Amino acid sequence: MQGNFSKKIDPMSNLPFTVAALYCFAPLPQYESLREPLAQLCCANGIKGTLLLAAEGINGTVAGSAGAIEKLIAHITAIPGLGEPELKYSHASEMPFHRMKVRLKREIVTMGVEGIDPLKSVGTYIAPKDWNALIADENTVVVDKRNDYEYAIGTFEGAIDPQTRTFREFPEWVKQNRDRLEGKKIAMFCTGGIRCEKATAFVKGLGFDDVYHLKGGILKYLEEVPREQSMWNGECFVFDERVAVGHGLAESDVELCRACRRPLTPQDKLSQFFEEGVSCAGCYAERQKQVKLAEKRGANKHIGS
């Protein structure tokens, strides 16, 4: 189940840039031929961001004027065999991307497991309005399908952090934590929904039946569920210069450490290890880890010297 093209760009937004996050799983055997027309359209209309093309479909986040984004979405939905993408709009005060990239990939979201096809088997979609009831159920185990640095600045109440650094690590985490999932309703969520398409397909392939995922991801939940009813705590990391968004998809005060690219909350910036443009507590912790590893190997402890 995919498709959310009926959702229109908010004409009342007073912010100059429209951000469109989209994906669609569909067989695209000639996907290489789609690259140049997409790149030309985006460049001609001042659109920036990233689009990924693979034999399994399309995925990406782009930004531009409302009119430019409408042209791009119309072009994408007209691609033979593709259909309507899962689509989410938000807005930004400044262009959140530096350039436009249209890339050819083996997967539109890289899990690294052969044979995973969300078009054949996928978890049950749960609308944002129904999500709270599912995750409040005592027989539900809630799994944050994102990476550790995303979890660190915001997640749903009671969600498990698999402590993965990339999506490729998730299959191994599932195999090592089967006992935590057995006999439970498994509710997964991610930023926009695409990682859960493959994650739920993978988990169902292991024999789990009660597998669910948040339709439209955190972004759709933050857009549709009122703050006073929300079970979301913190901010949602996004992969652009906005860094994170909150309820109503409003831009947050989270920033990036320019050294290690970790998200930093205002509280993180109070750390003694934070130096603007140089380092943060995360940088320090990673460096200390490398120093200890070097000492165990008998190497020079002055890493990088």
Curated annotation (Swiss-Prot):
Swiss-Prot/TrEMBL keywords: Oxidoreductase, tRNA processing
General function of this protein: Catalyzes oxygen-dependent 5-hydroxyuridine (ho5U) modification at position 34 in tRNAs.
Domain Rhodanese, residue spans: 136-230
Origin organism lineage: Bacteria, Pseudomonadati, Pseudomonadota, Alphaproteobacteria, Hyphomicrobiales
Signal peptide: none
Record family assignment: Belongs to the TrhO family.
The protein, known as: tRNA uridine(34) hydroxylase
Highest taxon of the lineage: Bacteria
Reactions catalysed, as given in the entry: uridine(34) in tRNA + AH2 + O2 = 5-hydroxyuridine(34) in tRNA + A + H2O
EC number: 1.14.-.-
Stored Pfam families: Rhodanese (PF00581), UPF0176_N (PF17773)
GO biological process, one term: tRNA modification
Catalytic residues (positions): C190
GO MF terms, alphabetically ordered: oxidoreductase activity, acting on paired donors, with incorporation or reduction of molecular oxygen
Top-level class of the enzyme under EC nomenclature: oxidoreductase
Alphabetized InterPro entries for the sequence: Rhodanese-like_dom, Rhodanese-like_dom_sf, TrhO, TRHO_N
SUPFAM superfamilies: Rhodanese/Cell cycle control phosphatase (SSF52821)
